[in-house]
Amino acid sequence: MADRATHHRWEDLPREALNPKIGRRFITGDSMMIAHIYLDKGAIVPKHEHENEQLTYVLEGRLRFALGADGDQVVDVAAGEVLLIPAHLPHSAEALEDTLDVDVFHPPRQDWLDGDDAYLR
């Protein structure tokens, strides 16, 4: 467990290019992770699920999420809006515009830390 606060600036963190349309930066603590996700219009995050609870806060742009095993719950999330995705809920996303979102995960995404997130690449 960390016993000291750490201070970060997004622009000082390396921006990882996951594919030609999606990039990210993230910060990890003991029990949570926060990420800036950069999506070009038309970017697709394929259907996946994870053990982590997820909050997605769109800062700029707009994302369309398909939620559930059949993707039958469709939600558009615009700048200034937040989507809470429970653990183990299948979901995918499409960037309807160039988008910057903040994703918060609890616990941290171990697959991201291990580089085992091939669905994004």
Predicted regions and their residues:
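Structural motif
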Residues: 33, 55, 62-64, 90, ...
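Short, conserved beta-strand element in jelly-roll/cupin
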Residues: 38-40, 50-65
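Short histidine-centered beta-strand/loop micro-motifs
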Residues: 25-26, 37-38, 45-50, 67, ...
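Short acidic-glycine-tyrosine-enriched beta hairpin
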Residues: 71-87
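A cytosolic small-molecule/anion-sensing beta-strand core signal
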Residues: 59-60, 78-79, 97
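Ligand-binding loop in jelly-roll beta-barrel domains
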Residues: 87-111
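A short, N-terminal "cap"/entry segment at the start of jelly-roll beta-barrel domains
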Residues: 1-31, 35, 114-121
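Histidine-centered metal-chelating micro-motifs
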Residues: 44-46, 64, 83-92
